[in-house]
Amino acid sequence: MLTAMLFRPWAGQIIARIGPIKVLRIILLINAMALVLYGFTGLEGYLIARIMQGVCTAFFSMSLQLGIIDALPEKYRSEGVSLYSLFSTIPNLLGPLIAVGIWHVENMSIFAIVMIFIAVTTTLFGYRTTFANTQKEVSPKDEVLPFNAMTVYVQFFKNKALFCSGMIMILSSIVFGAMSTFIPLYTVREGFANAGIFLTIQAITVVIARFYLRKYVPSDGLWHHLFMMIVLTLLMVASVIVAFGPHIVSIFVYISAIFIGITQALVYPTLTTYLSFVLPKIGRNMLLGLFIACADLGISLGGVLMGPISDTVGFKWMYILCALLVTIAMTLSKIRQRQSVSKAS
């Protein structure tokens, strides 16, 4: 994840120069090599494979998302991003089940065969798709950018739309990361609910919400403050419910998992679609890469930052702090609304 986060802005720059189709073809081959490494190497090979997959993740996701943004009409852009997010979530549900099955078989040959199968099928399917659409590809002109892959990080603070959206994404992702990381420990220590059921409900909700609610994600380039407030309120309420989970009926804890799933399904597509409209066209790909890196950063901080906090003040107060972080995100949404109104006037 760290590798992907660092490479995303650079990936956006490369894609802007040579186009998403060519990048996708190269990344499919590198990903196949990384998957094969898993089946035939030890720990050293795993480290190399993980770094390779981090690079692949950065370029692969950027290629697909930028391709979707460029290819779809504006009114369908949010639906395209939502469906991309949906299909990127499904492997996270099926992957652990496959891994557990291979683990119980206790045969590394099966693991190697599965990795090779995934590598071959993804490469063949990806190449078939890109070849079928080659005639639609337009070679992008080289952009003269006012920043590069290193100085682009300064733009996070200079661009008001990017800053507000990025901070909302970071704060929300911190809560998502804290939920998925510490819910198992919290429920076992305090003896309430069931972490497996909670996380399953959350994951299923993400999938269902991204499919059935995709048409409600704004796709007009305007900042919809009321929509963001409703979505973020669900996350804030869920954080408070989880914080007081040991003292309430478990059914409310499971309902909070639904709230978290809905928020997780809607926040990312909403902000990504909005930025695809308002960011300057010159350097847009790099700036979008920087925003997507914010989601990676937030998930990481949810475990790295909130872990020591929970050790110091306990899980209850850590999740109350999560609710306060969401409140800050709601404040940023209000600030962005005022900025949009003043700019329009």
Where are these regions (language model features)?
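Cytoplasmic helix-loop-helix junction between adjacent transmembrane helices
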Residues: 51-87
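Conserved MFS/SLC helix-loop-helix module at the cytosolic interface between two early adjacent transmembrane helices
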Residues: 6-38
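Transmembrane alpha-helices of Major Facilitator/SLC transporters
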Residues: 2-6, 197-218
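Paired small-residue
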Residues: 44-53, 251-259
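Juxtamembrane intracellular "pre-TM" segments in multi-pass secondary transporters
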Residues: 133-165
